[in-house]
Design a protein with these regions (language model features):
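Helix-loop boundary and gating motifs at the non-cytosolic
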Residues: 5-55, 217-256
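A late C-terminal transmembrane helix in Major Facilitator Superfamily
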Residues: 339-367
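Hydrophobic core of transmembrane alpha-helices in multi-pass small-molecule transporters
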Residues: 20, 102-121, 226, 306-320
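Helix-to-loop junctions at the C-terminal end of transmembrane segments
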Residues: 60-74, 162, 267-279, 365-366
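A membrane-interface helix-boundary motif in multi-pass transporters
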Residues: 160-178, 363-382
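Cytoplasmic helix-loop-helix junction between adjacent transmembrane helices
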Residues: 111-146
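Structural signature of the two symmetry-related core transmembrane helices
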Residues: 78-93, 282-297
Length: 403
């Protein structure tokens, strides 16, 4: 690291603020995506298609952004992320100003938002990991927990906002939050440590395919995460359908989203202890098991109160997944491939998993309603958990430990 490296306090608190900002803007556009599309007259299948489009755009853009960052380490990651966010603002403004846009225009908007805004998250992770690997103990799990709280607060506020001002008003809030996040990212200290220059000796970044072929344990875990998130993501992306099927309203949806997000906050306080005790791989498996169990409990509910009561299980489900996945990647792939590894994990989980979850949810909702959707999600989650268990049984071999 440079002699003039930024203080730990600034790196830590600034990164926590970035996490809060990201999950606040994420809540404003993604948590209410299905509700907004239904409000604009789209069907469940079309809403599921838009969710799939958003995730597919991330699948394409995340490896491209990660690969570009690996090939051009002299370009600070914050410049790539902030530019991506500003381009997403332009698409979001168009979406807000054109409430009557058709299917194709709507698809294009979600391609841009999914490809540039949501895809910025793994590069934000990498911004912190660069300093963590230099011995700076940035509290990643606390940042993720505060992000969950921000998500929860924005969800409940937007629930009441949608009830009083209309669902379309949430788009304006989203634009303001993205601009604030772009400012936070742009002002984060740039990494000034030793970076590999083109032509220097040392390990070179692999392609995504080469990375998967050379690391079967990592690849099998990705497959399990993909199937697990295919079953878990619809439980939040289509929560509006679950709430209304149990007699709830838009305000109830906001409360449910608040409870879901707030339940992830306690993870920040016990994650490091669990990590030392169990390891990142077992924590990933645990997150798949409890995420699937949430679907089982939702299937057993009969009213909106039951849906609200189930949400705290998120603490051991998706609340564990995000920090555990970051540590698992950092421990499982070579140092030169860690940025790409984070993007590949994001592609398999929120990308492919979210895409297939959207298709699965939209199709089953139109075919047989909420209960059929929940049954399909449970089946996919169980398959994912079994693959994660199989990955843990593979020989660990030589691993790269988190410094």
């Amino acid at each position: 690291m440079s002699e003039h490296r930024p203080s730990l306090r600034r790196l830590d608190y600034h990164y926590i603020a970035m996490q809060a900002g990201f999950w606040a803007m994420f809540a404003a556009v993604v948590a209410y995506q299905t509700a907004l599309l239904l409000e604009r007259g789209f069907s469940n299948s079309e809403a599921g298609l838009m969710t799939a489009v958003r995730c597919l755009a991330g699948i394409v853009c995340q490896p491209l952004l990660g690969g570009f960052a690996d090939r051009h380490p002299q370009i600070p990651l914050k410049h790539i992320v902030s530019l991506s966010l500003l381009l997403s603002v332009a698409a979001g403004a168009w979406y807000w100003l054109s409430p009557g846009m058709g299917l194709w225009e709507t698809t294009l908007v979600w391609v841009i938002i999914g490809g540039l805004e949501v895809s910025a998250y793994p590069l934000m992770d990498a911004m912190a990991v660069q300093f963590i690997n230099e011995g700076m103990p940035i509290r990643y799990s606390l940042g993720r927990g505060i992000g969950s709280l921000a998500y929860a607060v924005v969800c409940v506020v937007l629930g009441f906002q949608a009830s009083s001002l209309g669902m379309e008003s949430t788009l304006l809030t989203h634009l303001g939050l993205v601009l604030a996040e772009a400012l936070l990212v742009a002002t984060y200290p740039a990494y000034r440590g030793k970076i590999r220059r083109p032509g220097e000796d040392g390990p070179k970044p692999q392609s995504a395919l080469s990375l998967l072929r050379s690391n079967p344990r990592f690849t099998l875990m990705l497959a399990g995460v993909f199937l697990g998130l295919t079953g878990i993501m619809p439980l939040s992306n289509f929560l509006v359908n679950i709430v209304t099927s149990r007699g709830g309203t838009e305000s109830d949806l906001g409360i449910a989203l608040f409870l879901m997000g707030a339940s992830e906050l306690p993870t920040a306080f016990f994650f490091q202890k669990l990590l030392r005790r169990l390891g990142s791989g077992k924590l990933l498996l645990m997150s798949m098991i409890f995420g699937t169990l949430k679907g089982v409990l939702l299937l057993c509910t009969f009213n909106c109160l039951g849906v609200l009561a189930v949400q705290p299980i998120q603490v051991l489900g998706y609340g564990l997944f995000t920090p555990a996945s970051v540590y698992f990647v950092n421990e499982s792939v070579p140092a030169a491939d860690r940025v790409r590894g984070q993007t590949v994990m994001m592609v398999a989980s929120n990308g492919l998993g979210g895409m297939m979850g959207g298709v699965l949810a939209g199709w089953t909702l139109d075919l047989g309603g909420v209960n059929l959707m929940l049954a399909a999600c449970i089946a996919s989650g169980c398959a994912g958990a079994l693959l994660c268990l199989a990955a843990l049984r593979l020989s660990r071999g030589k691993r790269n430990q988190l410094v």
